[in-house]
Every structure is written in C-alpha cells, then in structure tokens.
C-alpha cells in the first residue's frame, strides 16, 4: 500500500504562466522566473491488448529522447528528475525506457504515495517543485514526466531558471509510436489450444487467499489472448514461482489449463 498512490492527501500546487514581458511589468523578481525549455507529448497504442509488449513503453522512450534533443541536454546533465509514480511499475517502466538507473533519485516530491491525486494533477506538484529547485540552484535544470491512463499518455518537460537560447520548443513523436507493430488479439473461442504465459495477475479474496488468475498468453501465431482460472492451488503456486514464459493451454471457454 505504501508504494502506491494515495488520494487521501490534502495538498495544493499552482503556477502562473506568462510572458517575460508581463512578469517584468508585474514586478515579479527575476530570481523567481522559471522557463520551460522544451516539451513533448505522445501516447502508446491506446488499447493495452494491442501493445506489442507489456514490458516496454516506446512512447516514453521517444518522447523523452525528443524533449532532451529539443532542450539540447541529457539526463546526465539534469540534476532534478521526477517520474510519474502511481505504482512501482510506472517508475520502473519510465526509468527503463529513459535509461535511468533505479538507484538514482527519481522524484523531487516524494512521489504519489505522499502527494495524492487526483489523476495527472500530481504533475502540477512535480512542476511546482522543479521550479523551486531550479530557483535555488539556477545553474541546474529539471525534467518532469507525466503519465495518464494505463501507462498510455505521456508528456515531458525540461525547465530552467535561465531562458532557452533558441526559445521554447515543442514536438510530438507520435508518428514513430504509431509506426510500431501492434499485437493482434485472438477471440477466446478461437484461441483454444497451446499457449505461453506472457503476463498474469493473481487476485485474492478478503482473507488474503488466491482466488482468481487473469493471464495474457501468446499463441503460436504471435497473437495475444486472455484467459482466467479459478484454480486456487495454481494461484498460490503462481505467487511463489515465476510463470511468465511457461507453456499452458486454454480451452474454448477461456479457462487456463496448466
């Protein structure tokens, strides 16, 4: 529980966006100014079932690479990084796709377990904190990744206390993501036969005992199918033994047979 997002937190964050000319006219002290250097937006294949792999998030990779190119910097040169952290898997996927070590400091807010929601508003806290960080260390930059949906929508921003030499830049590498292959999905009735477990989750009852298995499997033709099982013994084994990659079978009703 302590690793996942906690929406029962009473917090607020805000920022004011305006031109440098307006900030000067309003008398905002120069050391309070923070400049967005670059931004990108893109999304994975919308339907999770169509994504080629559940362990890769190419839109994060393309979006992250592009925003760094636009900002003319690298993550090694950026001091302050905040990755969206609704669940541990989100941080792991983001870090993997961006080439960041999990040993690096990957949040400047403490993450969603401490910042709450709702939904993408967490990133307002991340941007506001990045602003405070670069104000205090104006020679440094901040990098923020925002995520929405089932690790579906991604936005990236690079921020600094000094203006970008060539002005703010924005782009979307969506065409690169859209060009990637999609996994075909075979209907349950047509998927009966041998398969290989690609991913699975074991749901537990109120007493904490395994109750239902839900799994994605890959068929011989490379397509994906979904199946379930109420075999509690198998569920218990799946909690203690890695089953990804193991051969199984599914019947015409979508039941997993080990």
Where are these regions (language model features)?
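Conserved catalytic cysteine-centered active-site region
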Residues: 3, 37-44, 54-59, 63, ...
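Phosphate/pyrophosphate-binding loops at sites that engage ATP/ADP/AMP, CoA/4′-phosphopantetheine
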Residues: 64-77, 189, 232-236
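Extended, hydrophobic alpha-helical segments in both membrane/secreted and soluble proteins
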Residues: 60-68, 77-94, 127
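Beta-strand/loop nucleic-acid-binding surfaces
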Residues: 222-239
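OB-fold/S1-family single-stranded nucleic acid-binding modules
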Residues: 253-258
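Short nucleic-acid-contacting surface segments enriched for D/E, G, S/T with interspersed K/R
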Residues: 234-251
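Condensing-enzyme catalytic core mediating Claisen C-C bond formation in acyl metabolism
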Residues: 1-55, 128-129, 136-137, 145-226
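Short glycine/threonine-rich loop-to-helix capping motif typified by GTGT followed
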Residues: 85-102, 117-122, 151-162
């Amino acid at each position: 529980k302590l690793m996942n997002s906690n929406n029962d937190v009473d917090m607020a964050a805000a920022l004011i966006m305006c031109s440098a000319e307006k900030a000067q006219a309003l008398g905002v002290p120069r050391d309070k100014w923070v400049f967005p250097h670059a931004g990108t937006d893109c999304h994975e294949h919308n339907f999770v079932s169509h994504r080629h792999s559940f362990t890769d998030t190419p839109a994060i990779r393309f979006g992250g690479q592009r925003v760094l190119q636009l900002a003319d910097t690298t993550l090694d040169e950026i001091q302050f990084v905040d990755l969206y952290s609704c669940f541990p898997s989100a941080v792991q996927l983001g870090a993997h796709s961006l080439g960041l070590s999990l040993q690096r400091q990957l949040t400047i807010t403490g993450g969603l377990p401490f910042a709450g929601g709702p939904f993408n508003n967490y990133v307002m806290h991340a941007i506001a904190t990045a602003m405070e960080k670069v104000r205090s260390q104006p020679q440094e930059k901040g990098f923020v990744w925002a995520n929405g949906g089932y690790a579906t929508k991604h936005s990236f921003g690079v921020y600094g206390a000094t203006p970008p030499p060539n002005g703010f830049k924005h782009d979307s590498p969506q065409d690169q993501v859209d060009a990637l292959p999609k996994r075909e999905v075979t209907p349950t009735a047509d998927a009966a036969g041998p398969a290989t477990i690609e991913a699975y989750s074991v749901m537990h009852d109120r007493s904490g005992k395994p109750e239902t298995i839900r799994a994605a499997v890959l068929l011989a033709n490379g397509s994906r199918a979904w199946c379930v099982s109420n075999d509690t013994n198998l569920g218990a084994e799946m909690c203690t033994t890695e089953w990804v990659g193991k051969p199984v079978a599914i019947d015409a009703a979508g039941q997993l047979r080990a």
